[in-house]
């Protein structure tokens, strides 16, 4: 799988090659796939095709996503949670070069020469086996790397390939944006308030 497995109360992994988010049970003791958040057609004909959750609503699936973040909310029912990410909005797979990502609405295939990436926030319902797009907004395009961080109502975005990072308010209006002159890319950007750090 591409990228690290994120340590949540249950384990979820973000897989670039399939543009999927995979929940893994018993990660360190007989791991097994619990369910998949992705497009059904990617998994068609495999042993996992019946594990793909149903997409509710009309939206383009995430493509090449990074920094998936699990969020519990006391206002949600048991078995529901939020999941937000930097949606690179790229359709590419080195292991499946003939797969038609454009049929899913993922028309970008370049790390640099794309139009738009997105912040995506899903509502996942494990009981119903569904996921829906609860929030999204456009951000500068980056086909690879990048990050998203919700912070006190604002959102910090790193579009890693062009070296752009920015903060947006709760209405997705740009507060400030910075561009670094870099030879490669910015892997991640996080903002900290330093409250509760050991040196205070």
Language-model regions, residue ranges each:
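Histidine-/acidic-rich catalytic cores in large beta-rich domains
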Residues: 11-200
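Short, small-residue-biased leader/transition segments that mark boundaries at the very start
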Residues: 1, 6-13
């Amino acid at each position: 799988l591409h990228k690290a497995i994120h340590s949540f109360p249950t384990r979820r992994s973000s897989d670039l090659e399939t543009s999927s988010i995979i929940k893994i049970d018993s990660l360190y003791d007989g791991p097994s796939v619990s369910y998949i958040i992705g497009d059904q057609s990617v998994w068609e004909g495999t042993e996992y095709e019946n594990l793909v959750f149903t997409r509710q609503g009309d939206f383009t699936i995430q493509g090449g996503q990074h920094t998936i973040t699990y969020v519990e909310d006391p206002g949600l029912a048991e078995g529901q949670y939020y999941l937000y990410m930097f949606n690179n909005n790229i359709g590419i797979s080195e292991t499946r070069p003939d797969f038609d990502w454009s049929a899913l609405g993922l028309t970008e295939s370049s790390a640099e020469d794309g139009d738009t990436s997105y912040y995506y926030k899903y509502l996942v319902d494990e009981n119903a086996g569904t996921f829906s797009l609860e929030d999204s907004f456009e951000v500068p395009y980056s086909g690879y790397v990048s990050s998203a961080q919700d912070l006190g109502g604002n959102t910090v975005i790193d579009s890693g390939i062009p070296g752009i990072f920015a903060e947006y308010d709760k209405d997705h209006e740009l507060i400030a944006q910075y561009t670094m002159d870099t030879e490669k890319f910015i892997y991640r950007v996080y903002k900290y308030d330093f409250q509760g750090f050991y040196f205070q």
